[in-house]
């Protein structure tokens, strides 16, 4: 007899993503959407500097993609342990914390290079990456907190560092994408096969695919518009 099939509690617990906890922890389907929205913000800023954009992506990769997600896996051990029973929680947590610190280090470098005001984004981003996954304070691990930590702040930071100023366009974009990532998060919640019916989870996965396709397409087109 084969191993029992576990119900999917996350939309990316499929295929190669569920083969290894370190690989799953990067949460690529969601992380690439985040990078797409960060790209949209950078390319719509009054100025566009490729080196600043690449540094922004590097800081986000360390802090939010590796750091926050690895910490989240260890903080949610009861949720993920059935899928990765041999995972080394201590090693994953340590890697997550170190990655957040690495992301903050890149952010500090950017601050001294371009604008000391960017340190505000670095400090807040580090705080969100470290404490959102462990649900402290409680208000942070809510839909508004998610929108702030994974949408509004990264988008506004990406917009600001390009021209070192914030205008109404940048603020409006950050608010819009902050709400958009909450919609994405709720669709991901609705894919939990332990909590919802097959029709519900199927439709939620379809909407997530459409959402990802839109994010990738918009981000790529706007990036090309700045590079060509």
Map each language-model feature to its residues:
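Short, Lys/Arg-rich, polar N-terminal cytosolic tail immediately upstream
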Residues: 1-23
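Multi-pass membrane catalytic core of lipid/isoprenoid biosynthesis enzymes
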Residues: 23-39, 52-118, 198-222
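Hydrophobic alpha-helical transmembrane segments in multi-pass integral membrane proteins
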Residues: 37, 103-106, 153-169, 216-228
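Short, hydrophobic transmembrane alpha-helix segments
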Residues: 41-54, 228
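Functional transmembrane core segments of multi-pass inner-membrane proteins
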Residues: 47, 147-191
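Intramembrane alpha-helical segments
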Residues: 89-162
